[in-house]
């Protein structure tokens, strides 16, 4: 079961603390699939809402397919996510907590189908971001010291 990442949301990892992840399928049209295979997607401002027992991806931008004709897709349309009922209920219970939201972390191909990795996230404050940077720099120093003294 190989999976190939085609779109990632690096902004989400910087601005949010990821608490839990889940993979979901996405209902797409043919030109959207072709555009995503050509790396024509952006998840920068995207988020997920749950309404009437269904999960929807909003604000995700998939560029129009360059070889498409008049039947090309809309760039920022609402896209339905394919999840089991218990997964939707689990996400809904987490989102009901204060400060938790569902953010798409990336899209990947799995067995020819486009899947999306969703994360239950909490927003980071400025001091949290600084602490993350400091921890990453310390880890880098430790790794370089270990490499030097091998």
UniProtKB/Swiss-Prot annotation:
Gene Ontology biological process terms, A to Z: trans-translation
Protein's UniProt keywords contain RNA-binding: yes
Keywords, sorted A to Z: Cytoplasm, RNA-binding
Keyword Glycoprotein set for record: no
Protein localization: Cytoplasm
Gene Ontology terms: cellular component: cytosol
Major subcellular location class: cytoplasm
Source domain of life: Bacteria
SUPFAM superfamilies listed in its UniProt record: Small protein B (SmpB)
Function: Required for rescue of stalled ribosomes mediated by trans-translation. Binds to transfer-messenger RNA (tmRNA), required for stable association of tmRNA with ribosomes. tmRNA and SmpB together mimic tRNA shape, replacing the anticodon stem-loop with SmpB. tmRNA is encoded by the ssrA gene; the 2 termini fold to resemble tRNA(Ala) and it encodes a 'tag peptide', a short internal open reading frame. During trans-translation Ala-aminoacylated tmRNA acts like a tRNA, entering the A-site of stalled ribosomes, displacing the stalled mRNA.
PANTHER family named in the record: SSRA-BINDING PROTEIN, TMRNA-BINDING COMPONENT OF TRANS-TRANSLATION TAGGING COMPLEX
Name of the protein in question: SsrA-binding protein
């Amino acid at each position: 079961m190989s999976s190939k990442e085609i779109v990632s949301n690096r902004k989400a990892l910087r601005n949010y603390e990821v608490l839990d992840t889940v993979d979901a399928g996405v209902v797409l049209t043919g030109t959207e699939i072709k555009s995503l295979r050509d790396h024509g997607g952006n998840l920068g401002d995207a988020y997920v809402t749950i309404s009437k027992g269904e999960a929807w991806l909003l604000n995700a931008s998939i560029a129009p397919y360059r070889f498409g004709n008049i039947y090309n897709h809309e760039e920022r349309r609402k896209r339905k996510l394919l999840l089991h009922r218990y997964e939707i209920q689990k996400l809904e219970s987490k989102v009901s907590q204060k400060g938790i939201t569902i953010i798409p972390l990336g899209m990947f191909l799995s067995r020819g189908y486009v899947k999306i990795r969703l994360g239950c996230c909490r927003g980071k404050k400025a001091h949290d971001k600084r602490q993350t940077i400091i921890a990453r720099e310390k880890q880098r120093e430790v790794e370089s010291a270990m490499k030097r003294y091998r």
